[in-house]
Every structure is written in C-alpha cells, then in structure tokens.
Amino acid sequence: MDIRAAEISAILKDQIKNFGNEAEVSEVGQVLSVGDGIARVYGLDNVQAGEMVEFPGGIRGMALNLEADNVGVVIFGSDRSIKEGDTVKRTGAIVDVPVGPELLGRVVDALGNPIDGKGPINAAKRSRVDVKAPGIIPRKSVHEPMSTGLKAIDALIPVGRGQRELVIGDRQTGKTAIILDTILNQKAIHDNGPDGDKLYCVYVAIGQKRSTVAQFVKVLEERGALQYSIIVAATASDPAPMQYLAPFAGCAMGEYFRDNGKHALIGYDDLSKQAVAYRQMSLLLRRPPGREAYPGDVFYLHSRLLERAAKLSDEMGAGSLTALPVIETQGNDVSAFIPTNVISITDGQIFLETDLFYQGIRPAVNVGLSVSRVGSAAQIKAMKQVAGSIKGELAQYREMAAFAQFGSDLDASTQRLLNRGARLTELLKQPQFSPLKTEEQVAVIFAGVNGYLDKIPVAQVGKFEQGFLSYLRSEGKAILDTIRTEKAISDDTKGKLKGALDNFAKSFS
C-alpha cells in the first residue's frame, strides 16, 4: 500500500489552516432537583434575575431565586422530560415577547408563541415583559373618554384613556361581558373614525377554561373585532409560571401602541388567578408566606403591572394604555387581601353584584359602591350635561326605596322620586353585545332625566328606548351628528331633541 506522506501532510496543513472555532461557548449548570414546575440548578453563577434559561429539548425557564449555592428556576412548560443532572444553558436574555401590529388578530401564549394555528408571527420588534413604568414627568392627567358603550358605566363611572378601572365581583356576575362589550364598542371607531381615536385591544385570559377563551375569540371574530385585538391566553391547564407571566406579556404588547402615540386597552381576566399562580410559585421556591399565604411582594406584583397603564404627555407622543383589571371576589367580600390591594392601586372600581344580576339588572353595577377617581374629566361635555343629575337621583331613589318598604302613605314628591328612580334604573339596563355610541347614550339619558319616561310603565321603558333610537337613526340623524361633532348640547340641539322626543312620544303607545 503506497502512503504518500507529502499528500497527507498537505491535507492536514490545509485542515489546520481552515479550522473554524465552531465550539459554542455558553455558561451551563446542572439540575440538582426538579418537581412541581420548579428546578434547582447548580452552577449558573452569573445568571441575572428574570433571565431566560434553556433545558434540554428546548424547554425554557426563568431564573427567579438567586441563592448562594443554587438558582431557583421556574419552568415554562412540562417538567416531565427534565431530570436530575441535566444541563441548563444561560441565554443571556431577560424574558421578552414579540410586539407590534403583526400580533393583531392573533391568539398567543404568555411567551408570544401563536396558538391559533394561523402560522408564525413575523414581528419586527421584541420587548421585555417586565419594564419600569413611566415616571411622573412623561405622564399627563387623564382627559379623553374611553367609551365602553354601556350606559351605566359611561354615564356614572366614566373611564378615561390611560386610567386603570377595576372590574370586581363574584363569579358569574358579568365581569368578562363588560370587557367584551368594551372591545366590541371600538369597532365603529376602527371602521370609520380618525386614526388618532382608534383603540387597539389586548385581552389577557389567566387561568380560564380553554372553552371559555375559544368562545371569547369566536364572538370577536364573528363581530369583526378580532382584527384590532390581541388575545394572550394562559389557560387553567398551563403551568403556573405561564399564568404569572401572561399579564406582563400582554402589557408589553399594549405598551408598544402607547409608546408609539397610539391608544390601547388591556383587560386582565383575572388578576386573582395570577396572584394564586404567583403564590404557588413562591411557596415552591420556599419564599416566606404572608397573609392568606401570599408572598410579601404580591402587592408589588400587581402595582408594577398596573402602573404601566398611563396617559403620556404630548412630548412623549400623547399615547395611552388603559387597563381594566378583573378581580373575582368570594361571597361579595371586597375586604379580602387581593381585592383591597388592587382597589388601592387602581383609579376606581366597577362593583358588580350577584343580587342585582339575578334581579335582571344587567350590567349588574352597584352604582353606590362603584367609583371613578377620574370622574367627569373622562366625559364629553354633552354627557356631563345629561348625566350630572342622574347619580344623585339614583342615590336618593335607593335611600327612599329602602324606607318606602315600611310606609304606604308617601307624599307626592317622594312618590315622584320613586317613579323616576325606577325608570332610570330600567333605562340603565342593557343587553349584552349591544354597545351604544356616546351620542345615542346622551339622547336616551336626556329623555330619562327630562321626565319623558315618567308617564310610561316601567316594563315599557326598554321598548321606548329602542323605538326612540331607531326613530333618531332614521329621522333625527342630524341631531346625533351634531352631538357627536360638537360634543356638547347647545340650546338649539336641546330644542331639537325635545321636539324629536315630543314627536316620538305621541306615536308611542
């Protein structure tokens, strides 16, 4: 066999010369123990808090506990395939998600991966999930209305762009329905409103049944509202770290619009389940428990999330992010730990009651306990003009109604107050999926506070409202247009409205 030494040495020299340093250098550690979605890892000495790490098989995790001899990592996904002694790699990146208009119309998980089967999302930008909220200087006070389309809310507890308004109540009181109607109400503006008024919606489902989320998406799709919405879903079967992360991921997606001079709305449904997921993680990471076994920083968990909803100043592009966090109470107990925390963080709350819901008052808003700490700054002048007196009248009505149960002989003024109150309560009822434009709400409430309903039987109030609205849409379109453009009721408009009401009242029987 002929061995050509010169040829072999030439080949070897060539290989040595062209040797590429292809070895991957990354800091690695070993899994010491794993279980319940938590891994204890030894050896990741320089890992950062909140950094993404990678387990074999592409499973991701996030370093939360940095201790002297090990790192506590929460696992995003199943921990079944991870075993003791496995190698864990640092990625060097803090947890981030894709953001931007490419996500509109999509359903994603807490890490921004699509779960709707419509193919990959090619987002140009990524953003960290946990960033610092805007300071005091970049902010501006809330002054533009964020219309929900619900009379009871827009008239009595108005929400402004950049506000955080808590929706709180027991299970099955219509909390999700309020968020859904608010999202559907933005369709009219998206279809033919100016770009500056458009409100992009993010809905974060935390710990809900998959069937419920699918139903929500289906309604949005059928009504053409999915095109301006992003759904972030961490369902009940997802691991606790995903449920903990989902609100932060959704918030980062909403902040993209806020920071680019646009307006966004985010609904967290619901933060009670996020707190439960966080409690589970904290206890498994051996952090000391506090009240109701929640960790000491559960207040900070919610405050740092909700402080990111803000109205930015004109220098910063005048964008806004409005938050509608949801909290589920147990037996109408608003004084539990998480409800009191979130009430103290937010700028007001919409309190929903089981009793009202079963009485057929829907949305089941308790007007006495609900407040908006922004108030009439978040209403157009026309709404202030008509809704100014309604809250006082309803408060008086509730007080009188409690007394009226005992006495039968009531004087005329009390009787009048009770009649008016019953009709106003009836007027504020609204079926689901039928949000009203602001100018239509103004016209309807105008009829209520000016005594046009006083002679109509309570049972006929809804029929009167429907009839009057269809009459206005056909005969009095000019009146509605004037209210929409002028955003106020001038004496001239008032006269026309009264004329339209008189005409309609004659024909209504």
Curated annotation (Swiss-Prot):
It catalyses: ATP + H2O + 4 H(+)(in) = ADP + phosphate + 5 H(+)(out). Gene3D superfamilies: 2.40.30.20, ATP synthase alpha/beta chain, C-terminal domain, P-loop containing nucleotide triphosphate hydrolases. It is found in: Cell inner membrane. The keyword Transmembrane helix does not apply. Pfam families: ATP-synt_ab, ATP-synt_ab_C, ATP-synt_ab_N. It comes from the Bacteria. Its EC number is 7.1.2.2. PROSITE patterns: ATPASE_ALPHA_BETA. It is a peripheral membrane protein. ATP binds at G169, D170, R171, Q172, T173, G174, K175, T176. GO terms for molecular function: ADP binding; ATP binding; proton-transporting ATP synthase activity, rotational mechanism. The record marks S370 as: Required for activity. Keywords: ATP synthesis, ATP-binding, Cell inner membrane, Cell membrane, CF(1), Hydrogen ion transport, Ion transport, Membrane, Nucleotide-binding, Translocase, Transport. One of its GO terms (cellular component) is proton-transporting ATP synthase complex. HAMAP family: ATP_synth_alpha_bact. F-type ATPases have 2 components, CF(1) - the catalytic core - and CF(0) - the membrane proton channel. CF(1) has five subunits: alpha(3), beta(3), gamma(1), delta(1), epsilon(1). CF(0) has three main subunits: a(1), b(2) and c(9-12). The alpha and beta chains form an alternating ring which encloses part of the gamma chain. CF(1) is attached to CF(0) by a central stalk formed by the gamma and epsilon chains, while a peripheral stalk is formed by the delta and b chains. Belongs to the ATPase alpha/beta chains family. Produces ATP from ADP in the presence of a proton gradient across the membrane. The alpha chain is a regulatory subunit. This is ATP synthase subunit alpha. The gene is atpA.
